Each structure stands twice: as C-alpha cells, then as structure tokens.
Amino acid sequence: MAAKEVKFGDSARKKMLVGVNVLADAVKATLGPKGRNVVLAKSFGAPTITKDGVSVAKEIELKDAFENMGAQLVKDVASKANDAAGDGTTTATVLAQAIVNEGLKSVAAGMNPMDLKRGIDKATSAIVAQLKDLAKPCADSKAIAQVGTISANSDNSIGDIIAEAMDKVGKEGVITVEEGSGLENELSVVEGMQFDRGYLSPYFINKPDTMVAELEGPLLLLVDKKISNIRELLPVLEAVAKAGRPLLIVAEDVEGEALATLVVNNMRGIVKVAAVKAPGFGDRRKAMLQDIAILTGGTVISEEVGLSLESATLEHLGNAKRVVLNKDNTTIIDGAGAQADIEARVAQIRKQVEETSSDYDKEKLQERLAKLAGGVAVIKVGAATEVEMKEKKARVEDALHATRAAVEEGVVPGGGVALVRALQAIEGLKGDNEDQNVGIALLRRAVEAPLRQIVANAGGEPSVVVDKVKQGSGNFGFNAATDTYGDMIEMGILDPAKVTRSALQAAASIGGLMITTEAMVAEAADDKAPAMPDMGGMGGMGGMGGMM
C-alpha cells in the first residue's frame, strides 16, 4: 500500500480552501446575464466554450492532492444541485464558496466547528421554508418561457421553444434534445405513441416516395413471443381479410416462413399487413406491450394468461385511426382504448415513478407515461459550428430541467433576489449558544453571495446594489441585463423555487462538512526524481577534459 500524507487542523483547512476557491472562481465567472465564457481544452479536437457551471466544474482537477480534495467537494455541490433540479449549479458553487470562506474564518478565530454547522443547518431550514412560501405557481406559457430564457443564459429563442414544446405535449410529455442539422432551433412533435422499432421487411412499404408503411384504420395483433410458423397466424389473417381492414402485428419477432407469407400476402393485396418487433426488452417489453394494448383497446396474446395465437379472434385485436412505420420508428395515432383504462394505467405508472429509486427506471417510466398521456416533442438545436452546437445543447438541457422544476414547485424572483428576501426568516432566529448564532450570521452573509456575484460579473458595485435591494420589498430587485431596478417577476426574471432551494441545501450540506474537517489523508507525493536510463558508455567523449 502506498504511503499516505496526513495534514491536520489549520494547515489541512488552508489547503482545502485553496482548492475550493480555484474551482469556485472558475465557475462563478459564468453567473448571471453578463457572465463570461470559460474555454475548456480537450485532449483532441477543438476546445469547448461554455457558460454552463457544471461543465466547467467537471473539467477541473488540481495537481496538489489536498487542494484537489477541496475542489472535488465543491464539484460535488454542483453535481448534487444538478441531480436534484437539473440547474442552479453555479449558484450552489457560489453559496458553498461563501459558506466555506466565512466558516473557516470563524473556526480560525476559535469557534466550535460543530456548533457553527448546527447554526448553519438551523438557518438553512428556515430559509428553505421561507422560499417555499415565496414561490408562486408557474402555470402559463409566458412564465415557462421566461424561466427557460433565464436558465439558458438569457437566450429568448430557447425559452420560447421549450414553452411551445410543453404547450404541445403537456407538462407530463417527454421532451428530448438532439443536435440539429440547420442553423436555427427546430421543434417537431410526435402525436400518438411512438416506439423505436421499424418495419421488419421493406416489402411492407406502401408509400415509396417517403419510404414508409402507412395503415389506415388498422387492427393491431399484439403477441409476446416469436412467430415463425404461419399456421398459428392463419385464423387471425383469415378473419382480418374478411373484415377488409389492414393489420399491424407487434411481436417479439416475426421470422422465416411467417414473415415470407405476410410479405407475399401484402404484395398480392390479399391482406394489407405490416409487422414490427415489440419495443423494449424482458419485463419492460411486456409492460410496453400492455401499454399498447390499453391504448388501442386490444389484448396481449400471451401464454401466461392462457391465450394462444391459434385461438385469437378479432375481439382480441386493438384498433387505431392510423399507424405509420418507417425503418426506425412506429407511430400509433389515435388508439381506440377506453379513456378510463388509459387514465388508470397512467396513475399506476405514476405510482411506480414515485416508488422507484433508480434514475434509469424513472426515466423509462416517464417515457412510457408520456407516450400514454401526451406525446413526444423533439427540440433540434441549430448552430453554425460544432463547438457552438455542444455549448447550446448543454444550455437547452439546463433550461428544460429548470422549466420542469418550475412547473413542479413554482417560481421565485430571480437574480439572487429570492435568497435575499428569504433572509427575513432568520431575522430573530437564535441558536442554543453564541457559536450557533455565529453560524446563523455566517449564512446570512453567504446568502447574499449570488446577487453580489451577478452584479460583479455585470461590472457593477455589489455592496451598493445589495443595499438597495434590501431596502426594497417583495419582488423588487436588480436586472443585471439592463442595469435597472424593478419588479423581477414583471421583468420576466424568474428562478424555479426548486433550483434555488436545492442549490442552498447542497451548498450548506457540503459547506458544513468542510468546516468540520479536522484531518485530511492523501497519497504522499513521490519525492524521488525518476531514475535516468542507463546511458550505455557514452563512447567517443574522450578529449573533453579541457571543458571544465
């Protein structure tokens, strides 16, 4: 095991503070409407230019192991805020830096670190409760657009496109962000249920100009096993042919003789048919087949429930207004399922979302929810260069998370004002002893840091602005984009309450841990110079004696 170096007390905390400040100073340059850019070098390709706090934080590793520990802990603040609300990373970093700097000064002056932490925690709880009271619901499109704009570093086009997407697919709908091919941002909305499986054979195509298979008013046969024997399918095919309607088969797979027979029937015009693999894998495939069954009013043909393919009748088939298949996707439009059944299924999936602890499962469940409840919107980000595209895509994703958070917990005045207003919650707050009171006072000063930094980045005088904002009340604040004072909500400067709350909680949590650090352990630096390789005799250097 490699030797370790251990630092204690003040010398450990000083090293940690250097790392905290290096990382926070790089990140906080991006805060606010007049925040600066940070250029990140890549091991290959062009450097990335960004105004996204968490992207900057992720890139920073320091050479000194003890300083690096401080930097990594602040990086953790940014990640925690990002995981909780998808945004607010820069605010969280600025708050953490202020808490750690103020806290370590107090520790150096002889205060008890544990009492300081208790004071900070007490004040944080009071401010979080106050933020929840300050929050106003974010219901209309205009407010959603404003939140998106602020989160995307004051880019109106991003705010507007997110509001439009939410308008079209509803608050529950899935909105995905992709890299576009043009210069402008584009929004495309998929009505109905879409899943990522295309037709099993190009011979099913009936619209050669667009390379799609389109079925009008089809019946849907849903099977949770492979179909390779055509005999199993014959009873259903004959019934469908008599009914004179097209058929879509969704099965684990259709292969061999069965697929060949379907293709021949389709080409001869006996039965208009298309086949597609069921989406997902394993248990998720079964659940998604069940979703399609409920959406279209059909039944999944499964041996688990005692149904075999030979015994399937028209009653077991689902109905839809239209189905469109291309080589990658299948879209079912206007399924004929009973609304009450669909709502019950949606409620069931919502419950699963609340209960699951896995982020991946949660994301997949939410996709299923959207496919049943609303639709899917795709925002294609446009830009002139690859570098700009990456930077813009990161901002669109941030803005999307922020708007979701705003819809969830409401909005508060932006620009650091909500935190300053929430200070009234700790006006008369007292700790159990004097050191806890110092912790409360410390947080009171730290909470002003985001507003101070926004003003500093805009080239203003932070103390003057903070003083003027404190004298005001309600939504009164400073608009750094235009250098004016006024009602932040009316000026459209809003932050999601969840983002502000998560930023403060993450910063107070990690800040408190750093203040109470007494020892740090890291790998000892290797002092020995690397051994020189054997120089192999250095022949021919004889007559150089006179050079000394």
Swiss-Prot record:
GO function terms (MF aspect): ATP binding; ATP-dependent protein folding chaperone; isomerase activity; unfolded protein binding
GO biological process assignments: protein refolding
Cited Pfam families: Cpn60_TCP1
Entry GO terms, CC: cytoplasm
List of residues binding ATP: 30-33, 51, 87-91, 415, 479-481, 495
Assembly and binders: Forms a cylinder of 14 subunits composed of two heptameric rings stacked back-to-back. Interacts with the co-chaperonin GroES.
Protein name in UniProt: Chaperonin GroEL
